[in-house]
Amino acid sequence: MTNIIFSLQPTFTQGLILGQLSVLVLLGLILKYLFLDSTKNPFETTSYHPQFDRKPARKQQAQDSQSQSEIDDVESLDWFNLLLQQVANVYRSKLRGDLAGAEGDETARQRIEAFANKIRPAGFLDLIKIHSVDLGAGAPTLFNARIRESDPNDPDSPPEIEFDAVYEDTLSLSLSTSYLFNYPTASFARLPISLTISLSQFKSSIRVIPPTPDSVAPVLTFTISPDFVLDLTTTSLMGSRAKLANVPKLHELIQHQVRRVLGGRATWKVVLPGLASVAEAKQQVLKQEQEESKRQEEA
């Protein structure tokens, strides 16, 4: 076999091997020079960043949708929705550094960019560049409030309040980064990625669980349903010179990761002022989790 491969006479085996090597080399050149980027400044190679049209009419539509009542109840939640709107406006203003116009937009962009690079997996993603941010104009709308009676198996448990929530706004984020290929050497090549992510709709039921009177560290617990609805709209570009637009698998991956993060943080506990410290509340929560885990193991 060795004599056949290294023979000076052209053979079928030599032609087959050379043909396969040629295909591999050609494929490597196509990937490296069309899709991958080996420059040190990846943000300079992509001049177009997909964005959504952010017209004032759309913001007005989002604001109008928040003010409409979903159902006719005896007790309206309009007062609480108005309160949520004001709270959301305060958070937006603080994120913008209490600045208006383009200056406030730039402040919010810089803060979000710093946070994104702080939590990014440095071994896989290059620096993240935030190009634009839309913080929205509305707030979640709550409706259909109802009371859930105490658990008959646990007479000490307090009644729970449950209501439905829907959030439709103009939240969007436009960014670019690069996926790093660390073989055969570190940062051997980069795959530039440009993304624009926009929220279409979030819908879920929310439970509010008050603390028991004898609780060591009284907290108010908010829990979203694990069956929440999350609709995101994404536009994407992948590649350096030759670009792939709106890859479906990338959209599915982003939506899955956002759902996973929300599902993992589906419970929020608010310490009641003057009754306990945050540290005491954390210790109480940890103790409850350990007891719950122990009961599950025994079962």
From Swiss-Prot:
Residues crossing the lipid bilayer are 16-36
A GO cellular component entry from the record: ERMES complex
The record's domain comment reads:
The SMP-LTD domain is a barrel-like domain that can bind various types of glycerophospholipids in its interior and mediate their transfer between two adjacent bilayers.
List locations, semicolon-separated.
Endoplasmic reticulum membrane
* Pfam families in alphabetical order: MMM1 (PF10296)
Q: Which residues form the SMP-LTD domain?
A: 73-281
Q: Which residues lie on this side of the membrane: Cytoplasmic?
A: 37-299
InterPro entries the record matches: Mmm1 (IPR027537), MMM1_dom (IPR019411), SMP_LBD (IPR031468)
Q: Keywords on this record?
A: Endoplasmic reticulum, Lipid transport, Lipid-binding, Membrane, Transmembrane, Transmembrane helix, Transport
Q: What is this protein called?
A: Maintenance of mitochondrial morphology protein 1
Protein's membrane topology? Single-pass type I membrane protein
Q: Which family does it belong to?
A: Belongs to the MMM1 family.
Instruction: Give the record's GO biological process terms.
Output: mitochondrial genome maintenance; mitochondrion-endoplasmic reticulum membrane tethering; phospholipid transport; protein insertion into mitochondrial outer membrane
How does the annotation summarize its subunit structure?
A: Homodimer. Component of the ER-mitochondria encounter structure (ERMES) or MDM complex, composed of MMM1, MDM10, MDM12 and MDM34. A MMM1 homodimer associates with one molecule of MDM12 on each side in a pairwise head-to-tail manner, and the SMP-LTD domains of MMM1 and MDM12 generate a continuous hydrophobic tunnel for phospholipid trafficking.
Give residue ranges on the Lumenal side. 1-15
GO molecular function terms listed in the Swiss-Prot or TrEMBL record: lipid binding
What is the annotated role of this protein in its UniProt record? Answer: Component of the ERMES/MDM complex, which serves as a molecular tether to connect the endoplasmic reticulum (ER) and mitochondria. Components of this complex are involved in the control of mitochondrial shape and protein biogenesis, and function in nonvesicular lipid trafficking between the ER and mitochondria. The MDM12-MMM1 subcomplex functions in the major beta-barrel assembly pathway that is responsible for biogenesis of all outer membrane beta-barrel proteins, and acts in a late step after the SAM complex.
Q: Which gene encodes it?
A: MMM1
Region span, Disordered: 47-68
